[in-house]
Amino acid sequence: MASTDARTIAHSYIQAVGAHDEKPLEGLLDDALIAQFAGATLDKTGWLTALRRLMPALVRNEIREVFSDGDRACVIYDFVTDTSAGAVRCVELLTVRDGRIVHIELLLDRVAFAPVNEELAERAAR
């Protein structure tokens, strides 16, 4: 049986994204997922689309710390890219219910992350 522990699920989610492994994401993310970052709110489809857009620049995620309390987990990790941004420190606050992530809040330095978006836009324009 799959773990329903928030810490384990959060760790698995960040690892799957960093490995560009979308298959486990379907089971880890609840259909009613709400994801928030940079003033935007996305549903599961929108979140997966956003992740797919970033994956060409993502080399890996390096998890630094995972904290959990009940159904909540906090993952601090470096989003390591092949862009001039290099590694960008990120924090994701996750809520898990019935073994699936129902809420994500992503915190990051938008200035440090800007080169990632700029270089992805340049690649798409080619």
Predicted regions: what is each one?
Residues 1-126:
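C-terminal and inter-domain tail/linker signature
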